Amino acid sequence: MEILRLDAISKNFGGVSAVSDFSMIQEDNTISAIIGPNGAGKTTIFNLITGVQRLDSGKLFFRGNDITKLPAHRIAALGMSRTFQNIRLFNNLSVIDNVKIAAGYKISYGMFNELFSMPSVRREEKELHEKAMITLKFLNLEKYAGQKPGNLSYGLQRRLELSRALMPDPHLLLLDEPGAGLNPNEIRDLMDTIRFIQSEKKISIIIVEHHMELVMNICPKIYVLDFGKKIGEGTPEEIGKNDKVLEAYLGDTEEI
């Protein structure tokens, strides 16, 4: 069953085509990747899917809902979560508070109750803390709960970003270059982590990534962009044999 459908979506910036008639279908409980050279339009597609930017044409459907014109917060509330290429953590807050904030749109108490510390607020705060600890423990981060993110290694900060993205219990997780800045050992750990998340949470994951080892090893379906246009899609084996893809991005097949 499909969880996400992109029907011929397009986006222009000042007359320059960033994404042109791009279509894809993401099946439930699967991992896919969108790859391509710098400036190919990969992150723009994520921005369009999440409502950060508006389509010029085309349609977006998520879990059977037409989300083409929905604002970002309503799309998130339907069960979509995202990480970013550049780590976006609150370094003045503790690790656990960073995770709590990620559940913000699900907090139901109002300003009056919060100001006067009503029982419902205390109960919800307790539940929020417990859920945040469970989320940290899921990715083996619970021992860092009271620390500041700046005290963590870069690899652990990346994992913390994943924890934040998992806090709202998404149906679809979008990972924007999760391997950026990681060393080979951290890349292998990341691959294991993504597989673990997908298998345990039973969610769909779409990855935008430059690191080919990561993509080829964990993504059964790959879409390739060049100058905003899709030039290939298929399995890692099919992508590795696609002449247009090799010419545009991958280089020699020995590099795959």
Task: Please place each PLM-identified region on the residue numbering.
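Glycine-rich phosphate-binding loops of nucleotide-dependent enzymes
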Residues: 1-256
